[in-house]
A protein has these predicted regions:
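Generic C-terminus detector
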Residues: 84-128
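Active-site flanking residues adjacent to catalytic metal/cofactor-binding acidic residues
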Residues: 2
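Glycine-rich active-site loop/lid that clamps phosphate-bearing ligands
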Residues: 54-88
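Short intrinsically disordered coil segments
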Residues: 46, 66-72, 117-121
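Generic structural signal for individual residues within well-ordered alpha-helical segments
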Residues: 28, 71, 110-113
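Active-site "cap" helix and flanking loop/linker of ATP-utilizing ligase/carboxylase catalytic domains
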Residues: 5-65
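Active-site lining segments that contact anionic ligands and/or coordinate catalytic metals
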Residues: 46-51, 74-76, 96-100
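Short secondary-structure transition/capping segments
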Residues: 25-40, 77-97, 127-128
Length: 128
């Protein structure tokens, strides 16, 4: 064994995508396990969830548009920006370098992917 990380998955997998696609609260289940309790991990439903990360070229953010439009799309559950106008954007070398992300939920995985892909078309980030 090289490494063992007894933790929840990152990049919104256990905090957002699993609950949106199955109804399972992974955070609660993890806490229950830590307390020696037996968590309920039976799926409550079967849906699709997807995430797309916002990427941009290097530079300083001059403008961000389209967020209100994306927030109004049915099935878009979360739009998160981690950078703002005036922030420096560098080449992505880790999760903390991301500008933000969009998460969707739909009846199928493909429909959720399509929602995210459509949402990304509306987000415009200008850098200099």
């Amino acid at each position: 064994m090289i490494e063992l990380g007894a933790r929840m998955g990152g990049d919104c997998i256990t905090t957002h995508l699993v609950p949106l696609s199955t109804g399972i609260d992974m955070v609660k289940a993890t806490i229950q396990i830590a307390l020696g309790e037996c968590p309920s991990i039976a799926p409550r439903f079967d849906k699709g969830a997807a995430i797309r990360y916002i990427e941009e070229t290097n530079g300083v953010i001059e403008n961000i548009s389209g967020i209100d439009k994306v927030n109004s799309i049915n099935g878009i559950e979360h739009v998160v920006l981690t950078k703002a106008v005036g922030d420096v954007v560098n080449r992505i070398s880790s999760s903390v370098d991301r500008i933000g992300y969009v998460i969707s939920q739909a009846d199928t995985a493909q429909a959720a992917i399509d929602l995210c892909e459509n949402a990304m078309k509306h987000i415009v980030i200008t850098t200099k």
